[in-house]
Structures are given as C-alpha cells and as structure tokens.
Swiss-Prot record:
Allosterically activated by ADP, AMP, or fructose 2,6-bisphosphate, and allosterically inhibited by ATP or citrate. Residues 390-403 are annotated as: Interdomain linker. Beta-D-fructose 2,6-bisphosphate binds at residues 480, 537-541, 575, 582-584, 642, 668, 674-677, 749. SUPFAM superfamilies: Phosphofructokinase (SSF53784). Substrate binds at residues 162-164, 199, 206-208, 263, 291, 297-300. ATP binds at residues 23, 86-87, 116-119. One of its GO terms (biological process) is canonical glycolysis. It comes from Aspergillus oryzae (strain ATCC 42149 / RIB 40). This is ATP-dependent 6-phosphofructokinase 1.
Amino acid sequence: MATTHAPAEPPKRRRIGVLTSGGDAPGMNGAVRAVVRMAIYSGCEAYAVYEGYEGLVHGGDMIRQVHWEDVRGWLSRGGTLIGSARSMAFRERAGRLKAAKNMIVRGIDALVVCGGDGSLTGADLFRSEWPGLLEELVKTGELTEEQIVPYKVLNIVGLVGSIDNDMSGTDATIGCYSSLTRICDAVDDVFDTAYSHQRGFVIEVMGRHCGWLALMSAISTGADWLFIPEMPPREGWEDDMCDIITKNRQERGKRRTIVIVAEGAHDRQLNKITSSKIKDILTNRLDLDTRVTVLGHTQRGGAACAYDRTLSTLQGVEAVRAVLDMTPESPSPVITVRENKLLRTPLMDAVKATKEVADLIHERKFDEAMHLRDSEFKEYHFAYKNTATPDHPKLILPENKRMRIAIIHVGAPAGGMNQATRAAVAYCQTRGHTALAVHNGFPGLCRHHADTPVSSVREVSWEEQDTWVNEGGSDIGTNRSLPSEDFETTAKCFEKFKFDGLFVVGGFEAFTAVSQLRQAREKYPAFKIPMVVLPATISNNVPGTEYSLGSDTCLNTLIDFCDAIRQSASSSRRRVFVVETQGGKSGYVATTAGLAVGASAVYIPEEGIDIKMLARDIDFLRNNFAHDKGANRAGKIILRNETASSTYTTQVIADMIKEEAKGRFESRAAVPGHFQQGGKPSPMDRIRALRMAIRCMQHIETFSGKSADEIAADELSATVIGVKGSQVLFSQMGGPNGLEATETDWARRRPKDEFWLDLQSTVNILSGRASFGEGKTGWSCYENC
C-alpha cells in the first residue's frame, strides 16, 4: 500500500484541533471560537473537525484550518456550527486508526474535545491507544517512521458540553444554564394558564440519569412536587404527593399546581414514573384538571445564556493553555468549574465518578448515588424539600430556640431579591421562626412602623411569599437610604419589634448599612444582634464576594440588547455601536458582557479612557473594516461603563469614531439604562438566592440563646455571605482583618481587589485588540482569509 504523504518535519506552528461531539449544547460555539482565537493568539494553528469523531475518521475536507474571522459572530449562535455526531466508526479500533492517520496527515498533535462523558471517554481511550495506533500505521505501510516522529505524543483536553449537567467534579457544564433558562421560561408561561383555569401541569424535562435540570427548575418555579432519578420517592409517594397538593390548594389557596419530572424518573424498584402516570393520579384522585407538557428538544435550542457564553469562552481559553502546558506524562485534563474558579481535573477521574452514579442508581443504592453528586446538588435538594412546603414537624425548633428575624432590602432593585426573601421566609416558617419583612428599607422602618392598619413591619404569610417565586425587583420595596440618617428611631424600632436577627439583601448600600449598625452597637445595644448581608446588585461590587444576586439577570438582559443591536450593525455592514452599561465605579458588568458578546473594546473606570487609547482603538476599527471585504456579521460593539470617563462620554466616543472614520464606517451610541436591571430573574439568580438565603438563616440560627454582649463580641455576628474562588463562605466585616478594613475601597464603592480584572485581558485577546499593531498572529490571519 502506498505511503500517504505527510509533513516529514513538524510544522513551524503547533496545530490544535477542536471538535464537538455527542448531543449539542448552547455554548459549544463559544468554546470553539475561544479555542480557535486563543490558539492563533498563542502562535498555533487551529483546525476544526466537522461532524465530531465522524469527521476525524473520514478526514479530508472534514478537517479544516480555521482562521480568526471564520468564527466571528459565533457567540450568539445556538447548537454547534462545526456539527456533531455520535460516531459508531470511532468506537471501533479500525475507526480510531483512520482518525490517527488523518491527524498526522494534517500535522495535528493536540485535540480539544467538547462533549459529554461518552465523548470524553472516547477521547481518553484514543490518547491511551495513540502509541499503538502509530506503530500499527507504520507496520501496515500507511505512514513511515519519519512521518510519525513529531507526533509521538497526543495531547487531549476535555470541555464538558452537556445540557444535563451530569459530569462529576464540576458545578456546571456548557449548556446547562441555557437549557434551564428554556425550561423556566416555559414554566413561567404555563403559570398564567394554570392560574386562569386552576389547572395542574406535569412538566417533563430532560435528564436520563441526572436530575439537575429537574431539581433546579423546580426550585426556580416553586414546583409543588419533584421526581429525579438520584432520589426516588418513598413507597406511597402517590398519597404524599396528593396530600401536599391538596393542602397547597385548599389550605393555602394556590390556584396552580406544577409537578416537575425528569425523563429518567423512577421509583425505588426502578419502575419508570412517567408524566402520563402522574397526570392520571392527579386527575383520578384529586379530580384536578391536569395537562402534560413535554418540553423535549426545545431545551437544547436557542442562543446560549450569558453564563454559558462566559463559561465556554473561559474554558476554551484555558483548554489551549492546558495544551501548551502539557508534558508527555501529563494525564488528560477536563476543564471544570467550582463556584467561580476554573480547575483542571483528571479527565478519567471525572468520567469514572459520573458513570459510577448511573451504576449506583441501577443497583438501587440511591443514598450512595446522592453522595457522589456534588455537595452543591445535595444542598439544593435539601433546600427544595424544606422550602416547597411548611409541613416539616420534625424540623420545628423548641420555643426557646425560635427567633424573630427582620428582612430588609437596601440599595437598587436587583433580580433575585424576592427569591432570597421567599427562601428566608419559607425556611423560617419551616423552623418555627418569625420572619418580619421591613417594607421600603430603613425609611419605611422609621417613618411607617406605627402606621395602621398596615405597618411597614409585618409577618409574611406562606401564600404571599409563594407568589414571589419568579418576580423581579423587590416586592417589599428598596431604596438607598442608610440607618445613620436616624439611628435613634432605628434602634427604637429594633427594640419595639424585638428583632433577634437581621437579614439584609442589597448592594454596596446594604454593606454600608450593616457596617454602620455594627459600629453603633456600643451606643445602641439593640444592634447587638446577628446581621448578615446577602449581596444583590447588578454592579457586583460588594466586598466579600465574587458574585451578587442580580448580576446574572443583568448580563442576560444586556446580551439580549447587544445581540439585537449587533444585528442592526451587521445589517448596515459598516457600523459600530457604543453601548453604555451600568455598574457605578465597577467595570464588572461591562467586562463580563464584553466577554459574552464578543465586544471589540471595553472601557471601564478601573482603567479609564485617554486620547491615546481611543486613537489606537479607532485604528483598530479601521483595520477591521478594511479587511472585512463584504464579510457577513460585520457589526461591531464597544462597551463603556457609565463612569469610565467624565470627559469621553458614550456619545462623545461615538462621535469621535464617526468623525475619524471619514465615511468608511459609522457609529451610534446606545444607552439601555435601567433596562439592564431586567425583568424576571434568571434561573441562576433564583437558585443561588435560595441556597444563600438559607445559609444566611442557618448562620443567624447559630446565635440563638446567646446574650447581646456575646453576640457583639463575635466577629462573625456582622458578616457578608459570598462566593470566593471555589467556596461559599461568610466573611467578617469588622476587626483588623475584616472586610471594612482590608478589602473595601470606600471612595469608589467597590472591593480593593476585583477578581474579574483579569477578564479584561481575555476580552482584548479574543477581540484581537491585544495583538493589534504588534505584528502578532491574531491579525496576520486576515491575509489567509
């Protein structure tokens, strides 16, 4: 057999291949775009393998070099634009032999695979067989010894693309939050018809072996009952379900009933629980007009949400870095995420743990299966069970342990505020505490606490909090006023209503309010109670956390806005939109949105704006448009934080670009303003609100029975709950090591150390701005387009 001609010498630049395999997931295109552009920026060549492993086996035109501009506009596209397939040929050694030959012919020695556990298992098997495959290719005369010398080692990096979020070792997989968004949108829409006709709806969602989508959608929509594969219902579940639904409708006045069921749901004997069976039970036993809605493949479709765009982009960049860092001895990694931190996890360890869960379910070892799920999954399941209904007599505390906990919103409205309050109230009612909502912030407390017949301080009923499950903004009212405006009256109100704990939901003003109360404890003993801040602000500028409720809702609203105006810009071919974002003196929203929409440039207050920067960026735009040559998706977006510069305003920048363009392209200013606060909260803000609010209540509970002086002496009696790296933790506000002294930039109303600042360089790399004018590969690729 004739030997195939392949490069005898290794190419001057390393060649990295990227493929998507298995079921498609929103965000896969973002991952491919990031791999391609980061590879080019790093001096490598990027190759796309079309139609998954099938393309690797067939070779030829199914393995193509991809240039910088080839992936323009991919972030907002759903599915996978390089195709995906479940390849039977690659499962056989003969198929993998062909794949190895095709890779060597193309000079590719590294592969980034985006897919589920099956796809990643195949990738690791391919790597383990690689030396044997090369040896066989030489023996059969397909390749020569000289041809395989540069390719003795195959580096493989995995990215988990799966809407089910079924991979162990990671909090989220690419596509899972986009799918969850589709489900929540559908259930939110069902609410109206269910309420109108007092109907019940059984909603079937995807998830054969993993109940993540079902659990998170149940939390996000306040479902009455839930079925997931990992934790089947106990014997007699039919009676339990009917009892809860009957109580919710007859005693609590609910007009709608929602039951969420994962497609892989079963009982403890592994008998399948179908949506039609559940419908029949509700219809026959409760005489409830019930409908079944099977969402099906709508859960896979559509553009990726903000989180999936950001996650896929950052993981794609990290995958290229991992390839370049790997040695012949390095195990294949999969890029995972824990809370807010990217990690490199041994691929086979993650795959093994994932398969073990499915095996344990099949063996009916359900407790062990739950144990192998991430701790976050178990925590959410516990939270759902204990907030879906107040009927938990075993959890009720004795009288002397019960507390009166005030809940107040401070600052601007943010998505998730209502959900945090709902979760706190539900938990309090489950435990026997009294939850007191303070309406309209501290002014409401001081001015209207004695109003009749309705005081601004009042208990929240189960029926009232249940209506907040998908509501945006703040139903109890919020404003920016602080307690220092009237300490005397505030303290008297604390005494009058006998507050034993304070739960404050809000932004930097909430942080400031608790700081003021803490510092006033010596003069006002009423403030010697445990106080917790749950950050909720679109600006994400609260010290002690890398995530604030509302920031994800804001980003989703903003990318929808940017996608729409980019379409306008692209339709006009040569147009730049300068979009003004909110965020105060923190550039988090602008930078993260810039990453999610593929902005050409992002201006933030941390860096400021000067004339040299603008001149360089205008040259950058000129170069962009000069090389477009009528290409599609040619519209450009620039994001500017509202306080990035007092001189170079959004309109001024747009006018400067238009003037300097000399008619070759044009620009427009766009200010979405308060539209960025969003409508209904995103699923991420809903579920994190539940988890963090319950943790806050549990933290306040630890102070039950302590004296006022004991509480004041405890540095954790005034805290902020937050995400830091891979952990969720409480950070003390006071003391020499507290947030107030060490992490707060009071003048600029933001943390001193902003974790996201490194993202700015990633935005610049992927837009090409970082390498413009430096002769880097990122722009020489235009000559090859």
